């Protein structure tokens, strides 16, 4: 199994709105090899909010297929980083993707 983490640094106070965007999935569940998604808010941050999107996949290839899919492009077409040409300010200050091999998994 494989896990990808997309760690978002957000303007303070924007975590809940960002998390709510995930309530209506945009097709990730249709990608072969997708297994689970967790969207978390880091507690007790000072100057910014932090949201992590953790996705569990059958393999890294499955994740890469998601990144290269039309479904991914459609789901992310309205995501803005910092500010757009139209002057709209995005709550996303930065993001970083981390990749993990899952060596052990237990679920009750």
UniProtKB/Swiss-Prot annotation:
Belongs to the antibiotic biosynthesis monooxygenase family. Heme-degrading monooxygenase IsdG subfamily. Residues 2-93 form the ABM domain. Heme binds at residues 21-28, 76. Allows bacterial pathogens to use the host heme as an iron source. Catalyzes the oxidative degradation of the heme macrocyclic porphyrin ring to the oxo-bilirubin chromophore staphylobilin (a mixture of the linear tetrapyrroles 5-oxo-delta-bilirubin and 15-oxo-beta-bilirubin) in the presence of a suitable electron donor such as ascorbate or NADPH--cytochrome P450 reductase, with subsequent release of free iron. Homodimer. It catalyses: heme b + 5 AH2 + 4 O2 + 2 H(+) = delta-staphylobilin + Fe(2+) + formaldehyde + 5 A + 4 H2O; heme b + 5 AH2 + 4 O2 + 2 H(+) = beta-staphylobilin + Fe(2+) + formaldehyde + 5 A + 4 H2O. Coiled coil: none annotated. HAMAP family: Heme_degrading_monooxygenase. This is Heme oxygenase (staphylobilin-producing) 2. Its main location: cytoplasm. The keyword Nucleotide-binding does not apply. InterPro entries: ABM_dom (IPR007138), Dimeric_a/b-barrel (IPR011008), Heme-degrading_MO (IPR050404), IsdG (IPR023953). The keyword DNA-binding does not apply. The record marks 66 as: Transition state stabilizer. Keywords: Cytoplasm, Heme, Iron, Metal-binding, Monooxygenase, Oxidoreductase. Its EC number is 1.14.99.48. One of its GO terms (cellular component) is cytoplasm. GO terms for biological process: heme catabolic process; iron import into cell. It comes from the Bacteria. Fe cation binds at residue 6. It comes from Staphylococcus aureus (strain MRSA252). One of its GO terms (molecular function) is heme oxygenase (decyclizing) activity. SUPFAM superfamilies: Dimeric alpha+beta barrel. It is found in: Cytoplasm.
């Amino acid at each position: 199994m494989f896990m990808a983490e997309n760690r978002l640094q957000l303007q303070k106070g924007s975590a809940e709105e960002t998390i709510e965007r995930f309530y209506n999935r945009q097709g990730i569940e249709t990608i072969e090899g997708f297994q689970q998604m967790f969207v978390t808010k880091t507690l007790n941050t000072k100057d910014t909010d932090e949201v992590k999107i953790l996705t569990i996949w059958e393999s890294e290839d499955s994740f890469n297929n998601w990144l290269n899919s039309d479904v991914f492009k459609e789901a992310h077409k309205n995501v803005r980083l910092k500010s757009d040409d139209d002057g709209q300010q995005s709550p996303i200050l930065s993001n970083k993707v981390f990749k993990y091999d899952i060596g052990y998994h237990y679920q009750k």
